[in-house]
Each structure stands twice: as C-alpha cells, then as structure tokens.
C-alpha cells in the first residue's frame, strides 16, 4: 500500500483539464485519493490498444488462510446473495423497449424515436454513449471478478454460489449494453463506428482496479461501482424525461433498477465481511479509498483522443450525470450502510483506517465546489462519438 501524503485537492476532480500536448494515456482519474503517485509501467502502443500506463501490479495480497472465509460462506451466499438474481423468464429484455422489426408499424416507430432524439442535446448523448460503452465492456468485468481468490469460477461452469452469481450477474448486465446500443443505433444521432471502435479498444485494454486478487477489495469496488451506475443511469433517466423522451427515460430508469438490485447484493457481502472480520474489512475499505476508485471504463480510447475518459467525465460532471458530489454521496452511503462509524474493537491500524474513511467525504465535497467553478470556464472540444461536433467540457 502506498504511503499517505498531503491531501491533494486536484485528485478529487472528476476530470482533468484538457491537455494541450499529446500525452501518454493514464488511468489516473479523478475521484478520491490522498496518496502520492504510485509506480507505473508504460505500455507501448499496439495495434489493438492505445499507449497507456498501468500501476505496477500487486497480486494475491490476501493471506491464504482468508480464502477459507469465502469457502465457509458458500451456503450463506446461496441463501442471501443468489436471491438478488431474477429468473430469466421474469427478466425484461431489450426488445421490450424497442420498435418491433416484425411489426407493420416498425418504420413509423423508428421515425418517432428519431424525432424524439432530435430534442436531446449533444452533451446528453456523450454521457449516454459513455454509459453504454461502459456497459459493453462486460467481458472485462467478468474477467476481473474471476481474478478474485476464493470466489472465482474455477471451471467456467462451476456450481459454487460465487461462480453462479458471477455468471448470472454478467448475464443480467449484458442486457444493459445491448439495449442502449440498439437505441443509440436507431436514433441516428451518434457515430456508431467510432463507438464500436471505442468498445473494442476498451475491452482490449482491460481495467486496472488494483484489487490484488482480493475479494475484500473486489467486493468493496463492486459495491461502489454498482451504486455509481445506479446513480448515473438514474440521472440520464431524469435528463431524458426533462428533454421530452419518456421512452428513453424508461429505458435508463429500468437499467438503474437492475443496478440497485446488484448493489444490494454486493453491499450485503461486504456487510457480512465486516461482521466476520471487521479489522481486515475496514483496512481494505481504506485501502481502496486511498488508491481511489477507478471507474470501469477509465482506459477508454477512440483511436483519436488520448484523454477521452477525462473529457467524457468532464461532460458528465458539468451536466450532473456523474459528479464528484455523487462520489462523496456514495462514500457516505456505504459508510452508513456498513455502520463503519459505529463499529468498535478495531486494532490501532484498523481505528486509523476507520477514521480515514469516515472523514473523507467532507473533503471531497469542498473540492466539488471548486470543480463547479472551474467547469464554468471549460472549453469546447470535438467528440468523435457525435461526428466530431463540439461539446463543452
């Protein structure tokens, strides 16, 4: 774990200012960190991925004896986590929200969809595309979950509760990207080829969440991320309704509902870990917050913009879709959900970790106020997802 250094306000921003010169892409994002820069390794440009940096990888940091904790929780997971999955036959499918291609009225429905889409500004589409691309990188997220010691799917069809959850969660999430992708395609408002290239680059690049094969770190990360996607899709639903597209609002709201259900499952796992191993869990929580929670799509690239994720994040921050305030809200939500501030009996190191996470959100909120002021002077830049039209950061 990197040592703590002085609190750096700029580390809490949801984006970085656009750079005037070409830079090696970095997964550095902006949300919450009070640690200094860790050692990174530059990855040279290859035909299937952009030049970038990743942190020096730490693997299998969880003590082997703690694997037994997760094996002992098999029955608990079956009774308490798998219940948050829905039977396939009761799940919505993308086609439930899209024009029926076998219908006589298909072309008229598509025409109506395209007319509604004309009322929505470009900035909103940048946010919606970014959300869709994030959802479409699902192979990476399943891969990440299967790096976690003690809970991975060892065979590809394992019947352990952890493996069943990972596969079924992936299957439920798969509908999100499918639905948004088809909707955006039919809208005619976005450059699908550039979006498809971005998805391919992103899946090829992977992600660098720094979870060290530890399910403690991994499930804290997924708890945070499911809450974040619930908020983001909820915000795009609200914006769509404000712009008069009730159907798109329904789509985004339905996806948000799924994310909320998944958040419930992941936060329940961490709650159980706090019950069994409070010291180890609070240390893991502080560790993830010191590293900062990198967004799943932080390595996105479209073949043109070396700072694409930072620019997407800036637009999302300005429009209120995904903000530093949300980050602070999520942190406070998790602290309250897991009753971190009320727990006692920690070691000295555990108590310091508890104090760190419980005092972090107010600092983030102070930085959010400064970020909002800076955003008012942000420039406009072209975005390949909307045919090179300019959007304000």
From Swiss-Prot:
Superkingdom in the source lineage: Eukaryota
Database matches in SUPFAM superfamilies: Ferritin-like
UniProt-annotated binding residues for Fe cation 2: 173, 226, 259, 262
A Gene Ontology cellular-component term: chloroplast stroma
Entry keyword set: Chloroplast, Fatty acid biosynthesis, Fatty acid metabolism, Iron, Lipid biosynthesis, Lipid metabolism, Metal-binding, Oxidoreductase, Plastid, Transit peptide
Cofactor annotation remark: Binds 2 Fe(2+) ions per subunit.
Subcellular location(s) of the protein: Plastid, Chloroplast; Plastid
Pathway: Lipid metabolism; fatty acid metabolism
Reported cofactor(s): Fe(2+)
GO biological process per UniProt: fatty acid biosynthetic process
Record's function text: Converts stearoyl-ACP to oleoyl-ACP by introduction of a cis double bond between carbons 9 and 10 of the acyl chain.
Subunit note: Homodimer.
Family from the record: Belongs to the fatty acid desaturase type 2 family.
Protein name in the entry: Stearoyl-[acyl-carrier-protein] 9-desaturase, chloroplastic
């Amino acid at each position: 774990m990197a040592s703590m250094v002085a609190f750096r306000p700029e580390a809490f921003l949801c984006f970085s200012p656009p750079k005037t010169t070409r830079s090696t892409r970095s997964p550095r994002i902006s949300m919450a960190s009070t640690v200094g820069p860790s050692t990174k390794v530059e990855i040279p440009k290859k035909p299937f991925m952009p030049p970038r940096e990743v942190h020096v990888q730490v693997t299998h940091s969880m003590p082997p004896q703690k694997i037994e904790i997760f094996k002992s929780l098999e029955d608990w997971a079956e009774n308490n986590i798998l219940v948050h999955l829905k039977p396939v036959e009761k799940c919505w499918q993308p086609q439930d929200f899209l024009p029926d291609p076998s219908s006589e009225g298909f072309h008229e429905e598509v025409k109506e969809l395209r007319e509604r889409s004309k009322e929505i500004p470009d900035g909103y589409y940048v946010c919606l595309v970014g959300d869709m691309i994030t959802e479409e990188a699902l192979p990476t997220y399943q891969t990440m979950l299967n790096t976690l010691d003690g809970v991975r799917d060892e065979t590809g069809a394992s019947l352990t509760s952890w493996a069943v959850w990972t596969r079924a969660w992936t299957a439920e999430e798969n509908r999100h990207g499918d639905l948004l992708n088809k909707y955006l395609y039919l809208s005619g408002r976005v450059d699908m080829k550039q979006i498809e290239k971005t998805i391919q680059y992103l899946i090829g690049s992977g992600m660098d969440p720094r979870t060290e094969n530890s399910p403690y770190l991994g499930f804290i990360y997924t708890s945070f991320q499911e809450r974040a996607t619930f908020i983001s899709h909820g915000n795009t639903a609200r914006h769509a309704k404000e712009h008069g597209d009730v159907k798109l609002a329904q789509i985004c709201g339905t996806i948000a509902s799924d994310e909320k259900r998944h958040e419930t499952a992941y936060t329940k796992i961490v709650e159980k870990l706090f019950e069994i191993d409070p010291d180890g869990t609070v240390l893991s929580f502080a560790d993830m917050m010191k590293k900062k929670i990198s967004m799943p799509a932080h390595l996105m690239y479209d073949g043109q913009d070396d700072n694409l994720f930072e620019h997407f994040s800036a637009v999302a921050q300005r429009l209120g879709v995904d903000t530093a305030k949300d980050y602070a809200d999520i942190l406070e939500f998790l602290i309250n959900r897991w009753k971190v501030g009320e727990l006692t009996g920690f070691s000295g190191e555990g108590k310091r970790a508890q104090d760190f996470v419980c005092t972090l959100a107010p600092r983030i909120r102070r930085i959010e106020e400064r970020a909002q002021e800076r955003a008012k002077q942000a420039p406009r830049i072209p975005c390949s997802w909307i045919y090179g039209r300019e959007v304000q950061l």
